[in-house]
Amino acid sequence: MSSPLEKPQIIAHVQKPVTYTLFDCKWIPCSAKFVCVGNLARGSGVLQVYEIQQGEAKLLQEAEKPKPIKCGTFGASSLQQRYLATGDFGGNLNIWNLEAPDTPVYSAKGHNEIINCIDGVGGVGIGEGAPEIVTGSRDGTVKVWDPRQKDTPVANMEPAAGETKRDCWTVAFGHAYNEQERLVCAGYDNGDIKLFDLRNMSVRWETNIKNGVCSLEFDRKDIVMNKLVATSLEGKFHVFDMRTQHPSKGFASMSEKAHKSTIWQVRHLPQNRDVFMTSGGAGNLHLWKYEYPAQRSRKDSDDVDMGVAGSVSLLQNVTLSTQPISSMDWSPDKKGLCVCTSFDQTVRVLIVTKLNKL
């Protein structure tokens, strides 16, 4: 990639101003539509569905909800139904049919406080086993839900009695490569990262990255754990090689100081797991490529396998706004198409070029 013209370019295709605070956006699988959720000025929540038509974003659906909606996922829904699961400021977990979004098809009082983050697995053709949703909240708990089971979570990871409750900011499923195996990774405001094994209900690994963990994502949910990216408050992100776990040192990792402000989100390209985008608090997006080391593991002095971290290279960066880009989502179907939202009350559809050349 010698000349600038050979590098991927990040092009703003559509910019759509809205009249509310945007918190999350998701592409609707197998469509040219996306959904946005957020907070109206009068304190209620809003859910909107847009479709890309002739270079414009056309509003198809809008529904107002009692509580502001913080996060959403299609990860536990079938490709036929494409139901959106959301978490709101009241601690409620709801699942919506976007064709008729007036009343939820599933509802549970999930948490005592705001649901900050949500993820799903077992739906949209990703991950083996039953569909499940995970939610993380300010109340310090991480809960796993089966949308076929009402009211009670199938797993509840909460601090032990006497432990301080930390604000859970981000959750991610991974390792769902067969019907038995499944992991949840959770990140907290004090820099803790915890990896929960749902098969034997234990903490498989934990670490601390010294700054609040804003976003976590495995490069793929439906394979044996490969890589995990964690982003943090001080403009730094960490990439953990999850293939080799050392008994005392854990997983090998590398870190990169990229943005000069909080890195709000990381999203891996669905069509290439070694390419990912980070979104920053100064309104910028950075596109990265992970390079594996020559050998991913080596023996330590006691002849025990330990991982070797790789490196990242910056492919492209662009500043879209003066406000934080709070969420972004790649299209699962069209390589290089993505949608992002910012606190400048604008949703943007972007096209990233030349990704097939990487």
UniProtKB/Swiss-Prot annotation:
Keyword Membrane appears in the UniProt entry: no
Q: Which InterPro entries does its entry note? A: WD40/YVTN_repeat-like_dom_sf, WD40_repeat_dom_sf, WD40_rpt
Q: Name one GO biological process term.
A: apoptotic process
Instruction: Give the primary localization class.
Output: other
Gene Ontology CC terms: dynein axonemal particle
- UniProt xrefs under Pfam families: WD40
Superkingdom assignment: Eukaryota
Name the chain's protein: Dynein axonemal assembly factor 10
